[in-house]
Amino acid sequence: LARVQSSPTFPRLGILGKGSDFTFLSMELLGPSLSTILKLIPGGKFSFSTAIRASYHILKCIEALHIFGYIHRDLKPGNILTREGTEYPLCLIDFGLSRMYINPTTGKHLPNRDKVGFRGTRAYASINAHNLRDLSRRDDLISWFYIIYEFIIEPLPWRKVENKVQILTKKENFDVASKVSPVAPELFEIWRSINSLKFED
């Protein structure tokens, strides 16, 4: 978090201190998460215009993190908090699963590892995450798409499924075109573009 303080899309750090048997960190007081807000809205859904604006600002948060050389690997509405009174109304939090994707010495993309452990939250994780593949920027964008799908279209088809194999199967059979084209055809083009990305893109 200290490395991304120059960007307003992340919480501002306050005081870091140490007591005799504890360490503490204070940070900017932020508003509720998008997940919390959705639960408070009748029908559990944003208006179309609010969903579009939120999608844009989430993407700006992701872009900022990627510019700093990190991928998040756990994007979900619960990790996006609101902030009042600024031109940056959303803030990205929870970097416990984040990882550098750029070699700080060479400036080049880190190589694709053969197999890794699962990272993320199953509802919003990419198929690559389910298949224990190394994640990159494209996987953050897939998680972003799942988020905005819920904002604009409807709950994800696997939202209430708990079995990880069944979740993966539903994702593999996810007919995005038939779901989004009648409402927001541009979303399908975004989905196609994201899925055309390679590991280092």
Predicted segments with their positions:
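Structural motif at the C-terminus of the N-lobe alphaC helix and the adjacent alphaC-beta4 loop
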Residues: 1-8
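Short beta-strand micro-motifs within the conserved protein kinase catalytic domain, predominantly
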Residues: 12-23
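Structural motif in protein kinase domains
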Residues: 30-40
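Activation segment signature within eukaryotic-like protein kinase domains
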Residues: 54-55
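Catalytic-loop of the protein kinase fold
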Residues: 66-84
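Activation segment/activation loop of eukaryotic-type protein kinase catalytic domains
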Residues: 83-119
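Protein kinase subdomain VIII
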Residues: 106-107, 118-133
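Conserved C-lobe activation region of Hanks-type protein kinase-like domains
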Residues: 127-184
